[in-house]
Amino acid sequence: KDGAVYFSGLYENGLLKGVAPKDFCCWRYWGKSSTACFLGGIRLRGADPASFRVLNYAYAMDKTAVYTTSGRIPDVELAAFQVLDNGQNDSGAPQGYAKDSRQVYFHNGDGKVKIIKGAEVSSFRSLGDTYFARDEKRIYAYGKQLSKAELTSWELLGHWYSRDAKRVYYLNREIKGADRDSFT
């Protein structure tokens, strides 16, 4: 209406200075013009608008870096980087798993992206809900290994609960005393 571009965020709203509406496109938290890239109302320093692309709710990248809603991920192998889910948890917040050829990443929307140590990159996959993942040897919940989980019998129950032949879990915590057989 007034020839300006505004953003509307959870905690604040504002004007994106120097951006023309005809030159601006956005997707959820991410935006770009021919001269700059944005996360909400924040200009992403050093981001390249010509190569910038949104990968999912939680991740975006350009020719030099991968970005999350918490900032850049250092030392990413850009050519091999891939997101493993839609990047949005069930409450609508940006969250999800990604990997390159060397390591696996988990972004929960609050702070730095976690590198999942010990994950088998080649077989690692998200189970689609942005909370749970697995590789050939382990189960992961919220970016952490379920160290006691028995891989062959583990199953996801829903609403952040899972179980194996011996235990019941809520995200990455064992629920002591829970009866595995009657817990559904």
Regions found by a protein language model. Give the residues of each.
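Non-catalytic tandem-repeat scaffold regions and their flanking low-complexity/translocation tails
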Residues: K1-T184
